[in-house]
A protein has these predicted regions:
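Active-site helix of classical SDR
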Residues: 557, 594, 602
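Glycine-rich flexible loops
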Residues: 1-442, 454
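Residue(s) in the substrate-gating loop at a strand-loop-helix junction
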Residues: 578
Length: 699
């Protein structure tokens, strides 16, 4: 499969690295970062490295220690503190154990730790039982291609390619079983060996130092890649094209309909965030005749079972079908494949063992692309990268001989591996306990400043993925830059003009293609009031206020509702109105009229969208400390011939609680609550954030 991940052999990139006399741990960090940045070698979060060192002890002595990549760290970004330090003499007891449960293994390793740090990696036993000083373990495309065939073929090819320098190890489950298996074949590993290929589990390379280990790894991976290239040239694996590859604009229009339907179908218990990939070479592979049959044979490494699922879903959709028919087809085909999954689950599950909610992480749609689903954008992107690497390995393995993954029973065991399922379940439980909007997608229109900017941060704090949209592109960019560091992968900015239908279309399209759908629209776009008596107001003043406060809002709500209906999981629409919507004010016909129109539109929307589970509510905020309100204060003060401070005092005195300027976060908090399950029975509502203005009380 043509793929940018494997477009060339791996280049040796050590040139700018530490010299031979550098600190050994610094050199290991550099090695790890090099591996982590090379997606042909390691996909995000995968792989592990280690070094054995003599460390000083508090009593002035020393201890032989294993420093190994800690659980939850990433080779691409790991630093010195990311390596767990363990006592090698204590770890040596593993040699004498015939079996060990995962729980016992983790407790044993915790007792071997020399200092606080990340929990030991599940591959720590393997690193500890191998005698070599520096070890690197990768899930590289080349090795996975070579070892996802029968044991007999894989072992023969490894022997032919490396003449004993690389040893083939049949599959054992990662953790203690793999370490025990390798320990048991120690007498078959010649002293000249520089590494091992692990069936379905990648490459392990040894070295005296980090530089040597890296050089050997590049050499081995490239030697395998050269062999694979000859196999690809000799055998046409995928066959002729069966499906067409539409132009980018056409397939993305289709994806706009398909993605929300997928998101709704997969998000029955917990919502998912989607990543969409329509790269040309990927679509060419999906269009091939044999691809559907090949991808149903499985993944290429247990690591990818965790990150990309057991099997991809395959959707065949009619490009000429109406939108409603496409949504129905997506739901039907996913439902059928869910039934197949449940049948597989019944074949191997214990009586009380539940089928997984996160059973499907990859969907392949010929003519459209690949969709990956996870609890957050970064994890969905990781699933994409893992499956891209796996798909290439699958095609390569078929060119070598015949692609063959693990037996179904082993796949089930790994999918339900308690050590990993516990992490997933704890993450979900923590999300539910601490976040009001986990895994949600929210658009904030007017998010560049004031209430909208505060809301963008509050929605993200609540667990949402947020699209910050504003007319001011610079403000949007600044808002995202200020928030993205706290919420990596969960914040994008889009410039939008709500007076322009094509601009609104682009905003909602970008949201769907980026995150897969939409759960909440918060509309807080606004213009400063244009004060003038009825006898002097101009038509263009009325139109300008209506365009933003009413017409733009209605257009945005309609687009949001369309996406939410495709998902079929309800949703929330919240808009910031104003006291002026219900309280007449002198010279405010343009502003008050537009806000009153917005409030009535929200009530109509609540009536129309309620049967779809879409809730629509309004917030009446007054004297909020925003640039827009402060401009309003200046204009009012000038019109009355008073100071700004005197004008603000007037506002303070008129509310029952006697509060001055209200922070925009107070409105943002209300918006988050209205969007959340806390208000799941509330629609058509009108809540105030104003300190108590009797004339603005809802009637």
């Amino acid at each position: 499969m043509p793929n940018p991940v494997s477009s060339a052999l791996i280049a040796d990139r050590w040139a700018q690295g530490p010299s031979a006399g550098a600190d050994p741990l610094d050199s290991l960090v550099y090695l790890s970062n090099l591996l982590g940045r090379e997606q042909r070698l390691v996909q995000p979060g995968g792989g592990n490295t280690s070094i054995k060192l003599l460390l000083p002890t508090a009593d002035g002595g020393s201890v032989e220690a294993l420093l190994v990549k800690g659980s939850g760290t990433d080779l691409r970004t790991i630093r010195r503190e990311g390596f767990t330090r363990l006592s090698l003499p204590k770890l040596g007891a593993l040699r004498h154990a015939d079996s060990m449960s995962d729980g016992d293994m983790m407790r044993f390793m915790a007792g071997c730790m020399l200092a606080t740090g990340p929990a030991p990696s599940v591959e720590t036993p393997l690193h500890s039982l191998l005698p070599h000083r520096v070890i690197a373990h990768t899930h590289d495309v080349a090795t996975m291609s070579l070892t996802n065939v029968s044991d007999g073929v894989a072992e023969r090819l490894v022997a032919e390619l490396f003449q004993g320098r690389i040893v083939y190890v049949p599959y054992s489950r990662p953790g203690f079983p793999l370490a025990h298996a390798v320990s048991g074949m120690a007498d078959r590993i010649p002293p000249t060996a520089i590494g091992m290929t692990l069936a379905h589990h990648g490459l392990v390379i040894f070295g005296d130092d980090a530089r040597q280990c890296y050089a050997r790894l590049v050499e081995v991976a490239d030697r395998i890649e050269e062999y694979l290239a000859t196999c690809r040239r000799a055998r046409q694996v995928l066959g002729p094209a069966r499906w067409s590859v539409p132009p980018p604009e056409e397939r993305r229009r289709a994806a706009e309909v398909i993605l929300p339907a997928v998101r709704g179908a997969l998000g029955a218990s917990d919502r998912v965030i989607l990543h969409y990939d329509d790269a040309e070479e990927l679509l060419t592979t999906l269009a091939a005749e044999r691809t559907p049959e090949l991808v149903r044979r499985g993944m290429t490494t247990p690591e990818h079972l965790l990150r990309a699922g057991r099997l991809p879903l395959w959707l065949e959709l009619d490009p000429g079908a109406a939108e409603d028919a496409t949504v129905a087809a997506v739901r039907s085909q996913i439902g059928r494949q869910r039934a197949e999954y449940e049948e597989y689950h019944r074949r191997y599950a214990a009586p009380e063992e539940r089928a997984l909610d996160d059973w499907a992480k990859v969907l392949l749609v010929p003519g459209v692309g690949m969709i990956t689903a996870f609890g957050d954008k970064n994890s969905a992107l990781t699933a994409n990268l893992c499956y891209r690497a796996g798909l290439e390995s699958l095609v390569n393995a078929e060119a070598v001989d015949r692609f063959q993954f693990l037996p179904e029973a082993d796949v089930f065991e790994f999918e339900h591996w308690p050590l990993e399922r516990r992490k997933v379940e704890e993450t979900i439980a923590q999300e539910r306990a601490t976040r009001l909007l986990p895994r949600s997608v929210v658009i904030v229109i007017g998010g560049g400043s004031g209430i909208g900017l505060a809301a963008a941060g509050r929605f993200a704090d609540a667990g949402a993925h947020v699209v910050v949209a504003d007319l001011d592109a610079g403000a949007t960019e600044k808002a995202v830059a200020g928030l993205a560091g706290r919420f990596p992968g969960r914040m994008i900015g889009v410039a939008v003009d709500v007076r322009d239908d094509s601009s609104l279309d682009a905003l909602f399209r970008k949201t769907v293609l980026e995150f897969g759908g939409l759960d909440c629209l918060f509309y807080t776009a606004g213009l400063p009031p244009r004060f003038a008596p009825l006898t002097a107001i101009r038509r263009e003043d009325l139109q300008r206020q209506l365009e933003v406060h009413y017409l733009g809002a209605v257009a945005a709500i309609g687009r949001a509702a369309t996406i939410m209906r495709r998902q079929g999981r309800g949703g929330a629409i919240v808009a910031s109105v104003s006291k002026a919507a219900v309280v007449p004010g002198k010279d405010a016909v343009a502003y008050a009229g537009s806000k009153a129109a917005l409030l009535q539109a929200l009530r109509v929307a609540a009536v129309e969208l309620g049967p779809d589970g879409i809730r629509v509510n309004a917030i009446n905020a007054d004297q909020i400390e925003t640039p827009l309100f402060l401009q309003f204060v200046r204009e009012r003060a000038a019109g009355r011939g008073v100071t700004i401070e005197e004008q603000l005092e007037t506002y303070r005195k008129r509310n029952l609680m006697g509060v001055g300027l209200i922070p925009p976060e107070a409105v943002a908090d209300m918006a988050v609550l209205l969007a959340s399950e806390k208000f799941r029975f509330t629609t058509g509502g009108y809540l105030t954030v104003d300190g108590g203005l009797p004339e603005a009380f809802p009637r």
